[in-house]
């Protein structure tokens, strides 16, 4: 059996410059907020995701797609550049309490064998981390996910995202990110996708210290995501995180959020988003070169 490794989703430099287009109801809300006619149709999301794959995948080492809106279309249309690996989201988002993703389970409809035949090299699992929910349940889910990936020769990517506790109102996001890393940073996955400390804001030294604390608890390669980070601050966030030990990024919003809902979608992706992704890839290569 052909077993993929993280080297199959990196750039030649060994760094990760990966694009996410697997946002689901959150993306629909972004289109609605941008003034798209309501209700925003599934086809609007699918078209945007497929166009993003076609236009931006040449500049990414991998692209993360979701089964619900675009995996099948991306495969059928050969939307992903040959130089770019495909990652498929293996998480099912369960809405509740007024938010699009209130809990997450492994998507039982996932077919790792088919994904591999379609050219997929990795699966991704979102793990919501709340201090007052059962740690063992999270660890068990990650273990099952890792086994699902590795038994089919696919790379396992976990994405712990912290949330306020179900009960009470005390929430220290920064401490929660560290606590999640302590719990899941040595859980047997191949890659850890993490929220940027401090939302990428503030003095560089503070960001670096926070990122180094995170690095101390993650016993696998790790990358940052861009949700919650101002897109103008994201290139610096990538530099700082990589200085602390990260190996790149897996991000969507910092690359394409600014063109959601604009006319001439393909043109916007090419003229506005592609240069951003290219620049981020250059930063990853530059930071990896410093490690040699």
From Swiss-Prot:
It is an enzyme of class 4 (lyase). GO terms for molecular function: 6-deoxy-6-sulfofructose-1-phosphate aldolase activity. Its EC number is 4.1.2.57. Signal peptide: none annotated. Keywords: Carbohydrate metabolism, Lyase, Schiff base. The active site is at residue 193. It comes from the Bacteria. It catalyses: 6-deoxy-6-sulfo-D-fructose 1-phosphate = (2S)-3-sulfolactaldehyde + dihydroxyacetone phosphate. GO terms for biological process: 6-sulfoquinovose(1-) catabolic process. InterPro entries: Aldolase_TIM, DeoC/FbaB/LacD_aldolase, LacD_aldolase, SFP_aldolase_YihT. Homotetramer. Belongs to the aldolase LacD family. Cleaves 6-deoxy-6-sulfo-D-fructose 1-phosphate (SFP) to form dihydroxyacetone phosphate (DHAP) and 3-sulfolactaldehyde (SLA). This is Sulfofructosephosphate aldolase. It comes from Escherichia coli O157:H7. The gene is yihT.
């Amino acid at each position: 059996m052909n077993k993929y490794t993280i080297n199959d989703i990196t750039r030649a430099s060994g760094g990760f410059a990966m694009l996410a287009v697997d946002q689901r109801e959150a993306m629909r809300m972004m289109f609605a907020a941008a003034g798209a006619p309501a209700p925003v149709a599934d086809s609007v999301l699918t078209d945007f995701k497929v166009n993003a794959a076609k236009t931006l995948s040449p500049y990414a080492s991998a692209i993360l797609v979701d089964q619900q809106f675009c995996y099948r279309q991306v495969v059928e249309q050969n939307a992903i550049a040959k130089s770019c690996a495909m990652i498929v989201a293996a998480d099912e988002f369960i809405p509740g309490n007024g938010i699009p993703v209130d809990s997450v389970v492994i998507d039982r409809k996932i077919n790792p064998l088919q994904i591999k035949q379609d050219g997929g090299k990795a699966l991704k699992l979102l793990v919501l981390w709340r201090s007052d929910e059962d740690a063992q349940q999270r660890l068990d889910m990650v273990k099952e996910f890792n086994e699902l990936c590795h038994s089919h020769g696919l790379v396992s990517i976990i994405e712990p995202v912290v949330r306020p506790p179900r009960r009470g109102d005390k929430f220290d996001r920064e401490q929660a990110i560290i606590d999640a890393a302590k719990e899941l940073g040595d859980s047997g996955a191949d890659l850890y996708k993490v929220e940027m400390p401090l939302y990428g804001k503030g003095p560089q030294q503070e960001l670096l210290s926070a990122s180094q604390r995170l690095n101390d608890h993650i016993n696998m390669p790790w990358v940052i995501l861009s949700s919650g980070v101002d897109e103008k601050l994201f290139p610096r966030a990538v530099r700082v995180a990589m200085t602390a030990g990260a190996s790149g990024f897996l991000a969507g919003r910092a690359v394409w959020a600014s063109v959601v809902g604009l006319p001439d979608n393909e043109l916007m992706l090419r003229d506005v988003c592609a240069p951003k992704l290219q620049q981020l890839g250059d930063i990853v290569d530059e930071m990896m070169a410093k490690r040699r």
